[in-house]
Regions:
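Flexible, low-complexity charged segments
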Residues: 1-114
Length: 114
């Protein structure tokens, strides 16, 4: 691959101090959901780090509610990119006001049907 076609992916600092989120899906027979999420923000963006820390409880509450509104079908691995984008956009639009997260990654994700 020639150099001009190589896209350098931006690297991020990661906020990893969110608690593990545990909830149930919205299916008629709910499944258990357990996720651990890391939020990526621009390197050296102290404002993002500070605001995420200040709004940590709101973010955890949002994530718990978000996953409790999903179905097992919604949470399938092939939908993870969409879920990550939805989480990023909703945190940026509804929770953060002075900064932006750039990426969301699952560091753990289990969906267990009863």
């Amino acid at each position: 691959v020639s150099e001009e076609y190589t896209v350098k992916r931006e690297s991020y600092d990661w906020y990893t101090s969110l608690d593990q989120i545990r909830t149930s899906t919205s299916d008629p027979v709910p499944a258990s959901v357990s996720v651990t999420i890391a939020l990526g923000y621009k390197k050296e963006d102290k404002a993002a780090s500070t605001e995420i820390t200040e709004r940590r409880i709101e973010i955890i509450d949002f994530l718990r509610r978000f996953f409790s509104e999903q179905t097992v079908e919604d949470l399938k691995p092939q939908n993870e990119e969409i879920i990550r984008q939805q989480i990023r956009d909703q945190i940026n639009d509804d929770i953060l006001s002075n900064s932006r997260i750039r990426d969301v990654r699952f560091t753990g994700k289990d969906v267990v049907q009863q």
